[in-house]
Amino acid sequence: MGAQSKYAQQLNNERSLAPFIPFRSQVGPTTVITRDGDFVRTWRIAGLAFETQDKEKLLIRKDQLNTLFRAIASNNVALWSHNVRRRTWDHLKSFFSNPFCDALDKKYYGSFSGYRMMSNELYLTVIYRPVPAKISRLFNVAVHRSHAEILQEQKLAIRKLDEIGNQIETSLRRYGGDDGRGIEVLSTYEDKHGALCSQQLEFYNFLLSGEWQKVRVPSCPLDEYLGTGWVYAGTETIEIRTASATRYARGIDFKDYANHTEPGILNGLMYSDYEYVITQSFSFMTKRDGKEFLTRQKQRLQNTEDGSASQIMEMDIAIDQLGRGDFVMGEYHYSLLVFAEDMETVRHNTSHAMNILQDNGFLATVIATATDAAFYAQLPCNWRYRPRVAGLTSLNFAGLSCFHNFRAGKRDGNPWGQALTLLKTPSGQPAYLNFHYSKGDEDNFDKKLLGNTRIIGQSGAGKTVLMNFCLAQAQKYLHNAPMGMCNVFFDKDQGAKGTILAIGGKYLAIRNGEPTGFNPFQMEPTAGNILFLEKLVQVLVSRDGQHVTTTDESRISHAIRTVMRMRPELRRLSTVLQNVTEGSDRQDRENSVAKRLAKWCFDDGTGKRGTFWWVLDCPQDQIDFNTHSNYGFDGTDFLDNADVRTPISMYLLHRMELAIDGRRFIYWMDEAWKWVDDEAFSEFANNKQLTIRKQNGLGVFATQMPSSLLNSKVASALVQQVATEIYLPNPKADYHEYTDGFKVTNEEFDIIRSMSEESRMFLVKQGHHSMICRLELNGFDDELAILSGSSDNNELLDQVIAEVGDDPSVWLPVFQERRKARIASSKSTGR
């Protein structure tokens, strides 16, 4: 006799689990057989990222799911699906040599303490039930059959299950990332001790105990082996005790269903802050049984006069659709088990879950009869314990069990190792942010993949803080980098100044009329550098539209090569001028290279300074990527100065090009459109967007003016050649700029426009998938004073560094002390 559920037991009435476990043995790497001879296989499904998906696409996926159900429909087949929401915890491990980055990282991950980090895991189980005659021969009179015959019957059943499994895997492989790895069968594996373990049994054991643990494949029957807890069933509450914890559960099922089951109708539960398990089963009916069921439903409506004319007409339509094969019918059951650590909390969580279900049109009720039966019905094949079995169409089932989930990004196996950082999300799902976009579970470490990133956000949305936070987090990639790492930040309005200096970098604010600290002639006298210097000087002497003749080129080359043979401290543009020969006639002398070059020199040959001496003729060059791995250059002033913009850009880009030598490299551009407006930067960005990945580098581009970026000279490269797109809130976002220019979907655009500017949320997109993330830095006042790059804090920073030096360990405490004193004084004055 099979185990019978006892109703209305007292909470402390222990029940033995064995009679309620239908499984007998593991008969293959992915297959379990039950006592009744059913063959069972389970898959883990990554899930369709619904949160930012267009509704039309979700409907298409629902129809495709219905098509799959129709394809595998047979009264020999049944499905169990599970949505498991449980608490999780994660912390990316990083090593920082810089104290500011290390302290920021520790404080940031410390802020996750008490945060409800949750994960949603989706599972689909397929049960293949051999025909009754074969079941009878196999299991009731097996004694009369040979062992070989029994194995042959089993082999045929597994082959049929394989066929069904192939259809499922083909249809659901896109329920994940772009790599087609949205579904993974639960299989056996060997642990480090060589013992054979089973993911499938681990999942079934979790359903019984609420705990994930390694489960070895036993030699004894599974019903005697699984279940590492004790279950006590009360009228409405179940107590589950294990060696490590005691938990309480309450069940919810449906007394009546919503009028329509659009895909994701149950998704509201996936934002809750408590653990639960949703179990749904669907046992396919034959077409005849399905038609009989619908006909009985129609007759009931007619006989009881409960149904309106429209409802009866809907039943007629459903019968016609069933006949056409638009869907199939099945026996369906739903249960939601909500968990908590105490009775009061589980009651509160249950009430919250019921409100969500009822808001979506379901008549939900707490399971008060056969409470334990609903618990055991979580296990696939426990048909006898299913509460409130109903007839349902496969189309409805596709809406209720639609395998929606949240995108999480990629934690490990990225080109530079672990993800850049961990972010919070509205659902509590951990989100892993990366520059590079790499597929699925592949280990792409050290592979040269595209990593260019674009950040779009209006003023006040948090763009500067996000960029600087990412810059600080990226310092971890210096650790264990065989050739080192380098960051070059092309800044605007000195937004990154505090961060660059705090992480031990060097920051040069290029102001019109003030020495830049640039001296290109102190570079190593390599052939490549000399050729660059010749080109640079040619640009200097042709800025006013002057033509550079072949003779001019020869004179420039001779002067530069002469100077580059001198000691470094003697090499500068003024020395080049001294070595440029004059023309042989008056006309040549009037428009000579020397006269044109003089305005760029500290000494123009008459003891006077040239107009632009401050640009490239400084006594000591301040750029050295061997002493600093992080450089910041502020272009606020010089980018609007057409006279000096191109020469400065050429030198900066040449020095950066020299640093792109195989080491990990990131170049950052704030208000990128402004930088690429110059021809030198435009050419560089256009080429590097395509090639920098091969050199182990990437670019990060940001702007608060999408139209300017889209209208830039290299818009196509900045739009198309990116791996990661980040969109901060923008209530004033222009539809055509975002959808036509950046190719975001309508749903993504609506999210970008509807997110609150104070929410610190943003949308991250890679490939065709996106997720909503949040960088939460509440309580980070000291750190935000550095990361935000405000002008008043930059002024204070300059004062402090001028007094105590540029060692961050020295100036940071002084800066914070004075900043707080300034705020306190301001508050006092305000009173």
UniProtKB/Swiss-Prot annotation:
Q: Which domain of life is it from?
A: Bacteria
Cystine connections? none
Residues the entry annotates as binding ATP:
457-464
Q: Does the keyword Nuclease apply?
A: no
Q: Which Gene3D superfamilies match?
A: P-loop containing nucleotide triphosphate hydrolases
An example of a GO molecular function for this protein is: ATP binding
Q: Which UniProt keywords apply?
A: ATP-binding, Nucleotide-binding, Virulence
Enumerate the PANTHER family for this protein: TYPE IV SECRETION SYSTEM PROTEIN CAGE (PTHR30121:SF12), UNCHARACTERIZED PROTEIN YJGR-RELATED (PTHR30121)
Q: Which family does it belong to?
A: Belongs to the TrbE/VirB4 family.
Name the chain's protein. Type IV secretion system protein virB4
**Species of origin:** Brucella melitensis biotype 1 (strain ATCC 23456 / CCUG 17765 / NCTC 10094 / 16M)
Q: What is the lineage of its organism?
A: Bacteria, Pseudomonadati, Pseudomonadota, Alphaproteobacteria, Hyphomicrobiales
